[in-house]
A protein has these predicted regions:
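Intrinsically disordered, low-complexity terminal tails/loops enriched in metal-binding residues
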Residues: 21-170
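N-terminal export/membrane-targeting signals
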Residues: 1-23
Length: 170
């Protein structure tokens, strides 16, 4: 009996370890965002992975950069869209996720944050603590497209300030 229990725990441990290691395969394959260059491991809680029907993949840091890729590749059909769960950082199906828009937590590449959660209860708890609105993927993507002009200006301003600071240090 002890051998069976030990064997069972060993199998569970190995499967868990395999799942954890494969969960970050997308980060190894796409370590930085194609559009802004941000470190996808650092932003694992907001990263996205697009799998197109032609077999190509694109790794981004956020829904903002994913929206850009989807707009630039109108002739390619997304087969799967993955997003990092805000609370666990595991990749989940973006179209099945519960999305929170807005709130007090600063967003990634955007003024109006957009976070994905695998579980509705976790998203609702986050809402109570941080504010925002609950939506689905289509609502989050629409919000991202609505925000792109203002977000692009914000990103340009930040980068200009960073360049000025670097010049002052020289």
């Amino acid at each position: 009996m002890k051998k069976i229990i030990l064997l069972l725990f060993s199998v569970i441990f190995i499967l868990s370890l395999t799942t954890i290691l494969s969960a970050n395969e997308d980060i190894k394959k796409h370590s930085s965002c194609k559009y802004c260059g941000m470190d996808r491991e650092k932003f694992a809680h907001s990263r996205m992975l697009i799998e197109y029907d032609d077999g190509t993949q694109v790794g981004t840091c956020s829904l903002h950069c994913t929206a850009i890729d989807l707009a630039l590749n109108l002739d390619k059909t997304p087969k799967l869209l993955w997003v990092g769960d805000y609370s666990t950082q595991a990749l989940i199906n973006a179209e099945k996720a519960f999305w929170v828009i807005g709130g007090t937590k600063p967003g990634v590449m955007t003024k109006r944050a957009k976070w994905a959660f695998a579980q509705k209860e976790v998203a609702e708890k986050f809402l109570k603590e941080n504010g925002g609105n609950l939506t689905d993927f289509d609502g989050a993507l629409k919000a991202s497209y609505e925000d792109i002009a203002e977000d692009t200006k914000m990103i340009r301003d930040r980068r200009r300030m960073m360049r000025q600071k670097m010049m002052e240090k020289k």
